[in-house]
Amino acid sequence: AIAAVITFLILFTIFGNALVILAVLTSRSLRAPQNLFLVSLAAADILVATLIIPFSLANELLGYWYFRRTWCEVYLALDVLFCTSSIVHLCAISLDRYWAVSRALEYNSKRTPRXIKCIILTVWLIAAAISLPPLIYKGDQGPQPRGRPQCKLNQEAWYILSSSIGSFFAPCLIMILVYLRIYVIAKRSNRRGPRAKGASREGKSKQPHPFPAGASSARPPTLTSSLAVAGEANGHSKPTGEKEGKTPEDPGTLTLPPSWPAFPNSGEGQKEGICGTSPEEEAEEEEEECEPQAAPASSASACNPPLQQPQGSRVLATLRGQVLLGRGLGAAGGQWWRRRAQLTREKRFTFVLAVVIGVFVLCWFPFFFSYSLGAICPQRCKVPHGLF
């Protein structure tokens, strides 16, 4: 029964991690540089399932090491190498998540495939530095026990403690601290998000405009009539603000050509913009933005809501960059939403990785804890062989 369960786990591990590698390498949406960590981690798990678990299963079922002694030493070194690599990979992924959340702009510019590959190489070098000492320095092995051969890990206290700290306890501590820090940042971001959004909109609505110094601040400027420069460039003539009943001292109204949609000011109801009278090259744009009024007595159509509305920001952004205010609002809003969506994805991925790492730590902690007790107090704290 144990052999059947372990065999199923071996096949499941190989198949599942192979799918992970295949998905990352073939899917365009998963070709982000940070996903190379998952490819390397999946490769380490496949190596554990193919080169370590089958021989461990045979050793447990037979009760002795059936294979050669040389392979026993290589097998133990590979066991430490692959398992340490898996744990350090998770530590590197947690650090990558932390840098992506806390230093998004700075770190994303450095998160290139080359940089990720260098980090992965460092992870494997750390794992190799922990696993190779038993192959190089074998120490005092003492007399070999009679009977059937056994294949056991290095029993020297210095190696047990150093390998346990480097393979598990240090990476585990780093991951816990990093994910606590990510949680604090995410919680602070959630609290500050709505306030920052409101402050950003308020700041944009009160942003200074390129109007004369005498402009009144009693109400926000509106786009009602045509600009003199724009009107002359387009060959249109339009009454000035004085003919419209405006005083020369009221420069708070910015003018648009007749082909541009009007932005009605609250309480004044200007009807300067005429939908459908624009040139042919701008007809499609204005048809999307303008909706004619249903009033029968009106010969013109009020096209767009006030500037403070999201629709107004979008309309201004379509005026081919000639109205800087609308263009800035659209760009800032789009950038804010892109940033918000990126943070949401980062937080979701961080939560999933936290669950995976938590399960991983719970699985490995009993082994490394009991393994370390053998070096600290080999006689009093000896763990039963069956439990170990």
From Swiss-Prot:
Compositionally biased spans, kind Basic and acidic residues: 239-249
Protein's GO biological process: platelet activation; regulation of smooth muscle contraction; regulation of vasoconstriction
Transmembrane feature ranges: 1-25, 37-62, 73-95, 118-140, 157-180, 353-376, 386-388
SMART domains: 7TM_GPCR_Srsx
Composition-biased stretches (Acidic residues): 279-291
Annotated Low complexity bias: 292-302
Site annotation Implicated in catechol agonist binding: residues: S163, S167
Top-level division of the source organism's lineage: Eukaryota
Main location: membrane
Any Gene Ontology CC annotation: plasma membrane
Cytoplasmic side: 26-36, 96-117, 181-352
PROSITE patterns assigned to the protein according to its UniProt record, in alphabetical order: G_PROTEIN_RECEP_F1_1, G_PROTEIN_RECEP_F1_2
SUPFAM superfamilies: Family A G protein-coupled receptor-like
Keywords, in A-Z order: Cell membrane, Disulfide bond, G-protein coupled receptor, Lipoprotein, Membrane, Palmitate, Receptor, Transducer, Transmembrane, Transmembrane helix
Ranges for region Disordered: 193-309
Membrane topology: Multi-pass membrane protein
Disulfide-bonded cysteines: C72-C151
Extracellular side of membrane: 63-72, 141-156, 377-385
Self-association state and partner proteins as the record states: Interacts with RAB26. Interacts with PPP1R9B.
Free-text function comment from the UniProt entry: Alpha-2 adrenergic receptors mediate the catecholamine-induced inhibition of adenylate cyclase through the action of G proteins.
Similarity annotation: Belongs to the G-protein coupled receptor 1 family. Adrenergic receptor subfamily. ADRA2B sub-subfamily.
Name of this protein: Alpha-2B adrenergic receptor
Organism of origin: Orycteropus afer
Taxonomic placement: Eukaryota, Metazoa, Chordata, Craniata, Vertebrata
Gene behind this protein: ADRA2B
